[in-house]
Amino acid sequence: MMDATKYHVGYYPPPVEPGHVYEWTKKDHIEKAPAWCSVDLRDGNQSLIVPMSLDEKLEFYDMLIKIGFKEIEVGFPAASETEYEFLRKLIDGNRIPQDVTVQVLTQCRDHIIRKTFEAVKGAPRAIIHFYNSTSVAQREQVFKKSKEEIKQIAVDGAKLVKQLSEEYEGNFLFEYSPESFTGTEPEYAVEVCNAVLDVMQPTPDRPMIINLPVTVEMSMPHIYANQIEWCSNHLKYRDSVILSTHPHNDRGCGVADAELAVLAGAQRVECCLFGNGERTGNVDAVTLAMNMYSHGVDPKLDFSNMPEICATYERVTRMHIYERTPYAGQLVFAAFSGSHQDAIAKGMAYRKEHNEHRWTCPYIPVDPHDIGRTYDADVIRINSQSGKGGIGFVLEQNYGYNLPPKMREALGYKVKSVSDHSHKELSAGEVLHIFEDTFLNRRKPLNVIEAHFAQVNGITATVTLDLNGQRKVVTSVGNGRLDAVANAIQSATGMEFHLENYSEHSLDEGSTSRAASYVGLTWGDGTVTWGAGTDTDIIVAGVKALVSAINNK
Protein backbone atom coordinates (compact mmCIF):
# COMPACT_ATOMS: atom_id res chain seq x y z
CA MET A 1 0.00 0.00 0.00
CA MET A 2 1.48 3.34 -1.02
CA ASP A 3 1.58 6.17 1.52
CA ALA A 4 1.48 9.64 -0.06
CA THR A 5 1.74 11.36 3.34
CA LYS A 6 5.51 10.77 3.40
CA TYR A 7 5.97 13.16 0.46
CA HIS A 8 5.61 16.91 0.15
CA VAL A 9 6.30 19.66 -2.37
CA GLY A 10 10.07 20.05 -2.32
CA TYR A 11 10.59 23.00 -4.64
CA TYR A 12 10.70 26.72 -3.86
CA PRO A 13 8.73 29.18 -6.00
CA PRO A 14 10.28 32.59 -6.62
CA PRO A 15 9.37 35.32 -4.11
CA VAL A 16 6.92 37.34 -6.21
CA GLU A 17 3.78 39.28 -5.39
CA PRO A 18 0.44 37.45 -5.75
CA GLY A 19 -0.90 37.83 -9.28
CA HIS A 20 2.54 38.38 -10.80
CA VAL A 21 2.52 37.56 -14.53
CA TYR A 22 5.68 36.03 -15.95
CA GLU A 23 6.75 37.25 -19.37
CA TRP A 24 7.43 33.75 -20.67
CA THR A 25 3.72 32.93 -20.45
CA LYS A 26 3.08 35.44 -23.25
CA LYS A 27 5.13 33.40 -25.73
CA ASP A 28 3.84 30.39 -27.64
CA HIS A 29 6.92 28.98 -29.35
CA ILE A 30 10.70 29.11 -29.50
CA GLU A 31 11.91 31.47 -32.21
CA LYS A 32 15.65 30.76 -32.14
CA ALA A 33 17.70 27.72 -31.25
CA PRO A 34 19.72 27.97 -28.03
CA ALA A 35 23.41 27.17 -27.79
CA TRP A 36 23.75 23.42 -27.39
CA CYS A 37 26.21 21.62 -25.15
CA SER A 38 26.39 17.85 -25.37
CA VAL A 39 27.09 16.18 -22.04
CA ASP A 40 26.97 12.66 -23.49
CA LEU A 41 30.64 12.02 -22.81
CA ARG A 42 30.30 12.93 -19.13
CA ASP A 43 26.75 12.72 -17.74
CA GLY A 44 25.80 10.18 -20.36
CA ASN A 45 28.92 8.08 -20.06
CA GLN A 46 28.95 7.95 -16.26
CA SER A 47 25.42 6.50 -16.28
CA LEU A 48 26.24 3.58 -18.58
CA ILE A 49 26.47 0.09 -17.13
CA VAL A 50 29.69 -0.31 -19.11
CA PRO A 51 31.27 3.13 -19.70
CA MET A 52 32.69 3.78 -23.14
CA SER A 53 36.28 2.85 -23.90
CA LEU A 54 38.71 5.47 -25.17
CA ASP A 55 38.14 4.47 -28.80
CA GLU A 56 34.37 4.45 -28.31
CA LYS A 57 34.47 7.92 -26.77
CA LEU A 58 36.49 9.16 -29.73
CA GLU A 59 33.94 7.73 -32.15
CA PHE A 60 31.07 9.28 -30.20
CA TYR A 61 32.91 12.62 -30.07
CA ASP A 62 33.38 12.59 -33.85
CA MET A 63 29.66 11.87 -34.27
CA LEU A 64 28.73 14.82 -32.03
CA ILE A 65 30.88 17.12 -34.15
CA LYS A 66 29.27 15.80 -37.33
CA ILE A 67 25.81 16.48 -35.86
CA GLY A 68 26.87 20.06 -35.23
CA PHE A 69 27.52 20.44 -31.50
CA LYS A 70 29.81 23.41 -30.89
CA GLU A 71 30.23 22.78 -27.16
CA ILE A 72 30.99 19.28 -25.90
CA GLU A 73 31.56 18.33 -22.29
CA VAL A 74 34.30 15.75 -22.67
CA GLY A 75 34.59 14.61 -19.09
CA PHE A 76 35.62 15.05 -15.48
CA PRO A 77 39.39 14.69 -16.01
CA ALA A 78 40.17 14.49 -12.30
CA ALA A 79 37.73 11.60 -11.82
CA SER A 80 39.53 8.84 -13.73
CA GLU A 81 42.57 8.11 -15.84
CA THR A 82 40.35 7.27 -18.84
CA GLU A 83 38.71 10.70 -18.76
CA TYR A 84 42.07 12.43 -18.35
CA GLU A 85 43.61 10.41 -21.17
CA PHE A 86 40.64 11.08 -23.46
CA LEU A 87 40.98 14.84 -23.02
CA ARG A 88 44.72 14.70 -23.67
CA LYS A 89 44.06 12.60 -26.79
CA LEU A 90 41.82 15.35 -28.15
CA ILE A 91 44.28 18.12 -27.35
CA ASP A 92 47.54 16.41 -28.32
CA GLY A 93 46.00 14.91 -31.44
CA ASN A 94 44.62 18.27 -32.64
CA ARG A 95 41.12 16.78 -32.74
CA ILE A 96 39.29 19.91 -31.58
CA PRO A 97 37.95 21.86 -34.60
CA GLN A 98 38.30 25.63 -34.65
CA ASP A 99 34.59 26.16 -34.09
CA VAL A 100 34.25 23.62 -31.25
CA THR A 101 34.87 24.23 -27.55
CA VAL A 102 35.45 21.37 -25.14
CA GLN A 103 34.04 21.58 -21.64
CA VAL A 104 35.47 19.97 -18.50
CA LEU A 105 33.74 19.46 -15.18
CA THR A 106 35.15 20.01 -11.71
CA GLN A 107 33.83 20.28 -8.19
CA CYS A 108 34.72 23.35 -6.15
CA ARG A 109 37.58 21.50 -4.48
CA ASP A 110 41.17 22.69 -4.56
CA HIS A 111 42.98 19.56 -5.76
CA ILE A 112 40.28 18.69 -8.32
CA ILE A 113 40.37 22.18 -9.84
CA ARG A 114 44.17 22.02 -10.10
CA LYS A 115 44.07 18.58 -11.74
CA THR A 116 41.48 19.90 -14.20
CA PHE A 117 43.71 22.75 -15.34
CA GLU A 118 46.60 20.33 -15.80
CA ALA A 119 44.39 18.15 -17.98
CA VAL A 120 43.15 21.00 -20.16
CA LYS A 121 46.55 22.60 -20.74
CA GLY A 122 47.11 23.34 -24.42
CA ALA A 123 43.45 23.19 -25.44
CA PRO A 124 42.64 25.85 -28.06
CA ARG A 125 39.42 26.70 -26.18
CA ALA A 126 37.90 25.22 -23.06
CA ILE A 127 34.98 25.83 -20.73
CA ILE A 128 35.90 25.23 -17.08
CA HIS A 129 32.64 24.14 -15.48
CA PHE A 130 32.81 24.27 -11.68
CA TYR A 131 29.97 23.54 -9.30
CA ASN A 132 28.84 22.84 -5.77
CA SER A 133 25.49 21.75 -4.40
CA THR A 134 23.24 24.38 -2.82
CA SER A 135 19.92 22.65 -2.10
CA VAL A 136 18.31 22.53 1.32
CA ALA A 137 18.60 18.74 1.44
CA GLN A 138 22.28 18.76 0.49
CA ARG A 139 23.11 21.59 2.90
CA GLU A 140 21.42 19.83 5.81
CA GLN A 141 22.06 16.16 5.09
CA VAL A 142 25.27 15.92 3.06
CA PHE A 143 27.49 18.89 3.86
CA LYS A 144 25.92 19.92 7.18
CA LYS A 145 26.87 23.51 6.45
CA SER A 146 25.12 26.86 6.65
CA LYS A 147 24.12 28.99 3.68
CA GLU A 148 27.17 31.20 4.20
CA GLU A 149 29.49 28.21 4.31
CA ILE A 150 28.03 26.75 1.13
CA LYS A 151 28.33 30.11 -0.61
CA GLN A 152 31.94 30.34 0.51
CA ILE A 153 32.70 27.00 -1.16
CA ALA A 154 31.50 28.48 -4.45
CA VAL A 155 33.42 31.73 -3.95
CA ASP A 156 36.66 29.95 -3.04
CA GLY A 157 36.27 27.70 -6.06
CA ALA A 158 35.75 30.72 -8.31
CA LYS A 159 38.84 32.45 -6.91
CA LEU A 160 41.03 29.43 -7.58
CA VAL A 161 39.60 28.95 -11.08
CA LYS A 162 40.32 32.59 -11.89
CA GLN A 163 43.82 32.38 -10.45
CA LEU A 164 44.74 29.24 -12.37
CA SER A 165 43.28 30.59 -15.60
CA GLU A 166 45.84 33.38 -15.38
CA GLU A 167 48.69 30.97 -14.63
CA TYR A 168 47.93 28.51 -17.43
CA GLU A 169 48.06 29.45 -21.07
CA GLY A 170 44.73 28.96 -22.72
CA ASN A 171 41.53 30.47 -24.02
CA PHE A 172 39.18 29.76 -21.13
CA LEU A 173 35.49 30.37 -20.61
CA PHE A 174 33.86 29.71 -17.26
CA GLU A 175 30.66 28.08 -16.13
CA TYR A 176 29.22 27.83 -12.64
CA SER A 177 26.33 25.60 -11.54
CA PRO A 178 24.52 25.69 -8.21
CA GLU A 179 23.94 21.94 -8.31
CA SER A 180 20.50 20.78 -7.12
CA PHE A 181 19.13 24.17 -8.12
CA THR A 182 15.56 22.87 -8.19
CA GLY A 183 15.78 22.09 -4.47
CA THR A 184 17.32 25.46 -3.69
CA GLU A 185 15.52 28.67 -2.73
CA PRO A 186 15.73 30.84 -5.89
CA GLU A 187 16.83 33.92 -3.96
CA TYR A 188 19.66 31.95 -2.35
CA ALA A 189 20.71 30.43 -5.68
CA VAL A 190 20.93 33.95 -7.13
CA GLU A 191 22.89 35.10 -4.08
CA VAL A 192 25.47 32.36 -4.62
CA CYS A 193 25.64 32.94 -8.40
CA ASN A 194 26.09 36.68 -7.93
CA ALA A 195 28.89 36.08 -5.44
CA VAL A 196 30.64 33.91 -8.04
CA LEU A 197 30.05 36.53 -10.74
CA ASP A 198 31.60 39.19 -8.51
CA VAL A 199 34.76 37.10 -8.39
CA MET A 200 34.87 36.29 -12.10
CA GLN A 201 33.90 39.78 -13.34
CA PRO A 202 32.52 38.73 -16.75
CA THR A 203 32.13 41.23 -19.59
CA PRO A 204 30.06 41.18 -22.78
CA ASP A 205 33.24 40.24 -24.65
CA ARG A 206 34.13 37.53 -22.12
CA PRO A 207 30.78 36.31 -20.80
CA MET A 208 30.32 33.64 -18.16
CA ILE A 209 27.86 30.77 -18.19
CA ILE A 210 25.51 30.44 -15.24
CA ASN A 211 23.89 27.03 -15.41
CA LEU A 212 20.71 26.40 -13.39
CA PRO A 213 20.31 22.62 -13.52
CA VAL A 214 17.28 20.45 -12.95
CA THR A 215 19.58 18.09 -11.09
CA VAL A 216 16.48 16.31 -9.83
CA GLU A 217 13.13 17.17 -11.39
CA MET A 218 10.89 18.26 -8.51
CA SER A 219 8.10 20.35 -10.02
CA MET A 220 5.87 20.84 -13.00
CA PRO A 221 7.70 22.53 -15.91
CA HIS A 222 6.03 25.92 -15.48
CA ILE A 223 7.49 26.22 -11.97
CA TYR A 224 10.98 25.74 -13.36
CA ALA A 225 10.28 28.34 -16.05
CA ASN A 226 9.20 30.78 -13.33
CA GLN A 227 12.43 30.11 -11.45
CA ILE A 228 14.50 30.66 -14.60
CA GLU A 229 12.82 33.96 -15.44
CA TRP A 230 13.08 35.25 -11.87
CA CYS A 231 16.75 34.33 -11.62
CA SER A 232 17.45 35.80 -15.05
CA ASN A 233 16.00 39.10 -13.89
CA HIS A 234 18.01 39.12 -10.64
CA LEU A 235 21.46 38.04 -11.81
CA LYS A 236 24.20 40.66 -11.86
CA TYR A 237 26.16 41.30 -15.07
CA ARG A 238 23.16 40.03 -17.03
CA ASP A 239 24.50 41.28 -20.36
CA SER A 240 27.65 39.30 -19.64
CA VAL A 241 25.93 36.09 -18.57
CA ILE A 242 24.89 33.17 -20.76
CA LEU A 243 22.03 31.59 -18.84
CA SER A 244 22.08 27.82 -19.24
CA THR A 245 19.80 24.95 -18.32
CA HIS A 246 20.56 21.29 -17.64
CA PRO A 247 17.30 19.35 -17.17
CA HIS A 248 16.98 15.79 -15.94
CA ASN A 249 13.88 13.74 -16.55
CA ASP A 250 12.82 12.34 -13.16
CA ARG A 251 9.17 13.34 -13.63
CA GLY A 252 9.21 12.72 -17.38
CA CYS A 253 9.11 16.43 -18.23
CA GLY A 254 12.73 17.13 -19.17
CA VAL A 255 11.87 18.35 -22.67
CA ALA A 256 9.12 20.62 -21.35
CA ASP A 257 11.51 21.97 -18.69
CA ALA A 258 14.05 22.89 -21.35
CA GLU A 259 11.53 24.38 -23.78
CA LEU A 260 9.85 26.54 -21.16
CA ALA A 261 13.24 27.53 -19.74
CA VAL A 262 14.25 28.84 -23.17
CA LEU A 263 11.01 30.83 -23.34
CA ALA A 264 11.85 32.18 -19.87
CA GLY A 265 15.31 33.41 -20.82
CA ALA A 266 17.69 30.45 -20.96
CA GLN A 267 20.15 30.85 -23.83
CA ARG A 268 21.87 27.49 -23.67
CA VAL A 269 20.89 23.85 -23.07
CA GLU A 270 23.04 20.99 -21.82
CA CYS A 271 21.66 17.72 -23.11
CA CYS A 272 22.28 14.12 -24.19
CA LEU A 273 21.33 12.20 -27.31
CA PHE A 274 18.19 10.14 -26.78
CA GLY A 275 17.85 11.22 -23.16
CA ASN A 276 20.75 9.21 -21.77
CA GLY A 277 22.02 10.17 -18.32
CA GLU A 278 21.72 9.46 -14.61
CA ARG A 279 18.51 7.81 -13.37
CA THR A 280 15.79 8.69 -15.91
CA GLY A 281 18.30 10.58 -18.03
CA ASN A 282 19.18 14.06 -19.18
CA VAL A 283 16.93 15.98 -21.52
CA ASP A 284 16.90 14.49 -25.03
CA ALA A 285 18.77 16.67 -27.51
CA VAL A 286 17.08 14.96 -30.45
CA THR A 287 13.54 15.65 -29.26
CA LEU A 288 14.34 19.26 -28.38
CA ALA A 289 16.01 19.98 -31.72
CA MET A 290 13.39 18.20 -33.80
CA ASN A 291 10.54 19.91 -31.94
CA MET A 292 12.02 23.24 -33.03
CA TYR A 293 12.55 21.93 -36.55
CA SER A 294 8.89 20.88 -36.75
CA HIS A 295 7.96 24.53 -36.05
CA GLY A 296 10.16 25.82 -38.85
CA VAL A 297 13.07 26.83 -36.59
CA ASP A 298 16.55 25.72 -37.65
CA PRO A 299 17.92 23.88 -34.59
CA LYS A 300 21.51 24.15 -35.85
CA LEU A 301 21.90 20.41 -35.29
CA ASP A 302 21.83 17.94 -38.18
CA PHE A 303 19.83 14.75 -37.71
CA SER A 304 19.36 14.09 -41.42
CA ASN A 305 20.85 10.61 -41.04
CA MET A 306 18.98 9.49 -37.94
CA PRO A 307 19.33 5.74 -38.66
CA GLU A 308 23.13 6.01 -38.72
CA ILE A 309 23.17 8.11 -35.53
CA CYS A 310 20.90 5.61 -33.78
CA ALA A 311 23.03 2.66 -34.88
CA THR A 312 26.26 4.27 -33.68
CA TYR A 313 24.70 5.31 -30.39
CA GLU A 314 23.32 1.83 -29.65
CA ARG A 315 26.57 0.10 -30.58
CA VAL A 316 28.87 2.40 -28.61
CA THR A 317 26.72 2.87 -25.50
CA ARG A 318 25.13 -0.59 -25.50
CA MET A 319 21.84 1.17 -24.81
CA HIS A 320 18.62 0.52 -26.70
CA ILE A 321 16.58 3.34 -28.21
CA TYR A 322 12.98 2.65 -27.25
CA GLU A 323 10.76 2.06 -30.29
CA ARG A 324 8.48 4.97 -29.32
CA THR A 325 11.27 7.49 -28.68
CA PRO A 326 10.17 10.70 -30.45
CA TYR A 327 11.61 11.09 -33.94
CA ALA A 328 14.21 8.32 -33.49
CA GLY A 329 12.32 5.18 -32.47
CA GLN A 330 11.65 2.47 -35.03
CA LEU A 331 7.88 2.85 -34.70
CA VAL A 332 7.41 6.62 -34.34
CA PHE A 333 6.24 7.07 -37.93
CA ALA A 334 4.54 3.69 -38.16
CA ALA A 335 0.81 3.58 -38.79
CA PHE A 336 -0.96 0.24 -38.32
CA SER A 337 -4.48 1.59 -37.85
CA GLY A 338 -6.59 1.53 -40.99
CA SER A 339 -8.02 5.03 -40.53
CA HIS A 340 -4.56 6.47 -39.85
CA GLN A 341 -3.12 4.76 -42.91
CA ASP A 342 -5.92 6.03 -45.09
CA ALA A 343 -5.40 9.62 -43.92
CA ILE A 344 -1.64 9.40 -44.41
CA ALA A 345 -2.00 7.93 -47.90
CA LYS A 346 -4.42 10.70 -48.87
CA GLY A 347 -2.14 13.31 -47.33
CA MET A 348 0.80 12.02 -49.34
CA ALA A 349 -1.29 12.04 -52.51
CA TYR A 350 -2.46 15.61 -51.82
CA ARG A 351 1.12 16.73 -51.29
CA LYS A 352 2.16 15.20 -54.61
CA GLU A 353 -0.82 16.52 -56.58
CA HIS A 354 -0.44 20.07 -55.27
CA ASN A 355 3.38 20.12 -55.31
CA GLU A 356 3.12 21.20 -51.68
CA HIS A 357 6.39 22.29 -50.05
CA ARG A 358 4.94 22.87 -46.59
CA TRP A 359 4.58 19.67 -44.56
CA THR A 360 0.99 19.11 -43.40
CA CYS A 361 0.55 15.34 -43.71
CA PRO A 362 -1.93 13.95 -41.15
CA TYR A 363 -0.50 11.97 -38.21
CA ILE A 364 3.16 12.57 -39.16
CA PRO A 365 4.66 15.72 -37.57
CA VAL A 366 7.81 15.82 -39.74
CA ASP A 367 8.73 14.39 -43.12
CA PRO A 368 10.51 11.07 -42.42
CA HIS A 369 12.76 11.73 -45.42
CA ASP A 370 14.22 14.75 -43.59
CA ILE A 371 15.84 12.47 -41.04
CA GLY A 372 16.79 9.62 -43.34
CA ARG A 373 13.70 7.47 -42.85
CA THR A 374 11.58 6.01 -45.66
CA TYR A 375 7.85 6.00 -46.34
CA ASP A 376 7.72 2.37 -47.40
CA ALA A 377 9.58 0.83 -44.44
CA ASP A 378 8.80 3.31 -41.68
CA VAL A 379 5.37 4.83 -42.22
CA ILE A 380 2.74 2.36 -43.41
CA ARG A 381 3.05 -0.95 -41.55
CA ILE A 382 0.69 -3.81 -42.26
CA ASN A 383 -1.02 -6.05 -39.71
CA SER A 384 -4.55 -7.14 -38.81
CA GLN A 385 -5.46 -3.54 -37.87
CA SER A 386 -4.55 -2.12 -41.26
CA GLY A 387 -7.02 -0.80 -43.80
CA LYS A 388 -7.34 -0.51 -47.53
CA GLY A 389 -5.60 2.86 -47.68
CA GLY A 390 -2.41 1.65 -46.07
CA ILE A 391 -2.32 -1.61 -47.98
CA GLY A 392 -2.86 0.19 -51.27
CA PHE A 393 -0.17 2.73 -50.31
CA VAL A 394 2.36 -0.05 -49.70
CA LEU A 395 1.69 -1.61 -53.11
CA GLU A 396 1.85 1.73 -54.89
CA GLN A 397 4.99 3.02 -53.14
CA ASN A 398 6.94 -0.21 -53.46
CA TYR A 399 5.68 -1.82 -56.65
CA GLY A 400 3.73 0.81 -58.57
CA TYR A 401 0.27 -0.81 -58.38
CA ASN A 402 -2.45 1.83 -58.04
CA LEU A 403 -5.51 -0.26 -57.25
CA PRO A 404 -9.07 1.11 -57.56
CA PRO A 405 -10.55 1.95 -54.12
CA LYS A 406 -13.00 -0.97 -54.08
CA MET A 407 -10.28 -3.39 -55.11
CA ARG A 408 -8.09 -2.07 -52.29
CA GLU A 409 -10.92 -2.90 -49.95
CA ALA A 410 -11.15 -6.47 -51.26
CA LEU A 411 -7.39 -6.92 -50.95
CA GLY A 412 -7.52 -5.39 -47.47
CA TYR A 413 -9.85 -8.10 -46.18
CA LYS A 414 -7.51 -10.77 -47.50
CA VAL A 415 -4.36 -9.17 -46.07
CA LYS A 416 -5.93 -8.58 -42.66
CA SER A 417 -7.11 -12.19 -42.56
CA VAL A 418 -3.60 -13.49 -43.25
CA SER A 419 -2.08 -11.19 -40.61
CA ASP A 420 -4.75 -12.08 -38.08
CA HIS A 421 -4.25 -15.81 -38.51
CA SER A 422 -0.45 -15.60 -38.50
CA HIS A 423 -0.39 -13.10 -35.58
CA LYS A 424 2.33 -11.02 -37.17
CA GLU A 425 3.12 -7.90 -39.15
CA LEU A 426 3.35 -8.42 -42.90
CA SER A 427 6.19 -7.08 -45.00
CA ALA A 428 5.64 -5.26 -48.28
CA GLY A 429 6.82 -8.39 -50.08
CA GLU A 430 4.23 -10.50 -48.28
CA VAL A 431 1.49 -8.02 -49.21
CA LEU A 432 2.62 -8.23 -52.85
CA HIS A 433 2.53 -12.02 -52.70
CA ILE A 434 -1.05 -11.97 -51.39
CA PHE A 435 -2.04 -9.54 -54.15
CA GLU A 436 -0.42 -11.64 -56.86
CA ASP A 437 -1.80 -14.90 -55.51
CA THR A 438 -5.32 -13.52 -55.15
CA PHE A 439 -5.82 -11.14 -58.06
CA LEU A 440 -2.99 -11.12 -60.56
CA ASN A 441 -2.96 -13.24 -63.72
CA ARG A 442 -5.13 -16.05 -62.38
CA ARG A 443 -5.54 -18.50 -65.28
CA LYS A 444 -7.57 -21.38 -63.87
CA PRO A 445 -10.13 -22.75 -64.43
CA LEU A 446 -10.60 -20.29 -67.34
CA ASN A 447 -7.89 -18.90 -69.56
CA VAL A 448 -7.81 -16.94 -72.82
CA ILE A 449 -5.21 -18.54 -75.08
CA GLU A 450 -5.43 -15.91 -77.80
CA ALA A 451 -7.77 -13.26 -79.15
CA HIS A 452 -8.00 -11.62 -82.57
CA PHE A 453 -9.97 -8.47 -83.30
CA ALA A 454 -11.66 -6.97 -86.34
CA GLN A 455 -13.60 -3.76 -86.65
CA VAL A 456 -16.93 -5.12 -87.94
CA ASN A 457 -20.20 -3.87 -86.43
CA GLY A 458 -18.18 -2.43 -83.58
CA ILE A 459 -15.36 -4.70 -82.42
CA THR A 460 -15.51 -8.39 -83.27
CA ALA A 461 -13.37 -10.70 -81.14
CA THR A 462 -12.42 -14.26 -82.04
CA VAL A 463 -11.29 -15.82 -78.78
CA THR A 464 -9.64 -19.16 -78.04
CA LEU A 465 -10.61 -20.27 -74.54
CA ASP A 466 -9.29 -22.98 -72.26
CA LEU A 467 -11.87 -24.02 -69.67
CA ASN A 468 -10.85 -26.88 -67.41
CA GLY A 469 -8.47 -28.16 -70.08
CA GLN A 470 -11.03 -27.99 -72.89
CA ARG A 471 -10.35 -25.55 -75.74
CA LYS A 472 -13.08 -23.65 -77.52
CA VAL A 473 -13.07 -20.91 -80.16
CA VAL A 474 -15.88 -18.37 -79.97
CA THR A 475 -16.66 -15.10 -81.72
CA SER A 476 -18.56 -12.16 -80.27
CA VAL A 477 -19.10 -8.43 -80.73
CA GLY A 478 -18.64 -5.62 -78.24
CA ASN A 479 -18.25 -1.87 -77.87
CA GLY A 480 -14.53 -2.32 -77.36
CA ARG A 481 -11.96 -5.10 -77.33
CA LEU A 482 -12.39 -5.97 -73.64
CA ASP A 483 -16.17 -5.83 -73.91
CA ALA A 484 -16.05 -8.14 -76.96
CA VAL A 485 -13.87 -10.67 -75.10
CA ALA A 486 -16.22 -10.52 -72.09
CA ASN A 487 -19.21 -11.19 -74.32
CA ALA A 488 -17.40 -14.09 -75.98
CA ILE A 489 -16.66 -15.69 -72.62
CA GLN A 490 -20.27 -15.30 -71.46
CA SER A 491 -21.51 -16.77 -74.74
CA ALA A 492 -19.21 -19.79 -74.47
CA THR A 493 -19.70 -20.53 -70.76
CA GLY A 494 -23.20 -19.30 -69.94
CA MET A 495 -21.79 -17.04 -67.24
CA GLU A 496 -23.62 -13.77 -66.51
CA PHE A 497 -21.65 -10.79 -65.31
CA HIS A 498 -21.36 -7.07 -65.93
CA LEU A 499 -18.09 -5.22 -66.49
CA GLU A 500 -18.49 -2.78 -63.60
CA ASN A 501 -15.03 -1.27 -63.30
CA TYR A 502 -11.99 -1.00 -65.53
CA SER A 503 -8.84 1.04 -64.99
CA GLU A 504 -5.25 0.90 -66.15
CA HIS A 505 -1.92 2.65 -65.76
CA SER A 506 1.72 2.26 -66.70
CA LEU A 507 3.96 0.39 -64.26
CA ASP A 508 7.26 1.45 -65.81
CA GLU A 509 8.66 4.18 -68.00
CA GLY A 510 9.86 3.85 -71.59
CA SER A 511 8.68 2.28 -74.82
CA THR A 512 8.75 -1.25 -73.38
CA SER A 513 6.97 -0.37 -70.16
CA ARG A 514 4.45 -2.75 -68.63
CA ALA A 515 0.83 -1.81 -68.11
CA ALA A 516 -1.33 -2.81 -65.17
CA SER A 517 -5.07 -3.27 -65.65
CA TYR A 518 -7.80 -3.82 -63.07
CA VAL A 519 -11.26 -5.25 -63.70
CA GLY A 520 -14.26 -5.43 -61.40
CA LEU A 521 -17.21 -7.67 -62.34
CA THR A 522 -20.72 -7.64 -60.92
CA TRP A 523 -22.45 -11.01 -61.09
CA GLY A 524 -26.11 -11.92 -61.31
CA ASP A 525 -26.27 -12.75 -57.61
CA GLY A 526 -24.90 -9.31 -56.71
CA THR A 527 -21.38 -10.37 -55.79
CA VAL A 528 -18.37 -8.45 -57.08
CA THR A 529 -15.06 -10.03 -58.03
CA TRP A 530 -11.77 -8.38 -58.94
CA GLY A 531 -8.82 -9.23 -61.10
CA ALA A 532 -5.57 -7.64 -62.23
CA GLY A 533 -3.27 -8.23 -65.17
CA THR A 534 0.09 -6.96 -66.37
CA ASP A 535 1.66 -7.01 -69.80
CA THR A 536 3.61 -4.81 -72.19
CA ASP A 537 0.44 -4.82 -74.33
CA ILE A 538 -2.36 -2.88 -72.65
CA ILE A 539 -5.05 -5.01 -74.37
CA VAL A 540 -3.45 -8.22 -73.14
CA ALA A 541 -3.16 -6.78 -69.63
CA GLY A 542 -6.88 -5.96 -69.68
CA VAL A 543 -7.83 -9.46 -70.87
CA LYS A 544 -5.65 -11.01 -68.14
CA ALA A 545 -7.39 -8.84 -65.54
CA LEU A 546 -10.81 -9.89 -66.89
CA VAL A 547 -9.86 -13.56 -66.72
CA SER A 548 -8.52 -13.16 -63.17
CA ALA A 549 -11.76 -11.51 -62.06
CA ILE A 550 -13.81 -14.35 -63.60
CA ASN A 551 -11.64 -16.98 -61.91
CA ASN A 552 -12.22 -15.26 -58.55
CA LYS A 553 -15.94 -16.07 -58.72
Map each language-model feature to its residues:
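N-terminal capping/small domains of soluble enzymes
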Residues: M1-D110, V379-I382, S386, G392
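A mid-to-C-terminal "edge-of-domain" accessory segment
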Residues: M2-R42, G296-T475, S511-R514
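Alpha/beta enzyme core
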Residues: A4, Y11, W36, M52-E71, ...
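Short, small-residue-enriched loops and turns at beta-alpha junctions
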Residues: D43, S47, P77-E81, S135-A137, ...
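Short beta-alpha connecting loops at secondary-structure transitions
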Residues: L212-V214, I242, E270-E278, M290-D302, ...
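Positively charged, aromatic-enriched nucleic acid-contacting surfaces
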Residues: A461-L465, L507-W530
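Mixed-charge, glycine-accented linear interaction segment located at domain edges/termini
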Residues: T527-W530, T534-K553
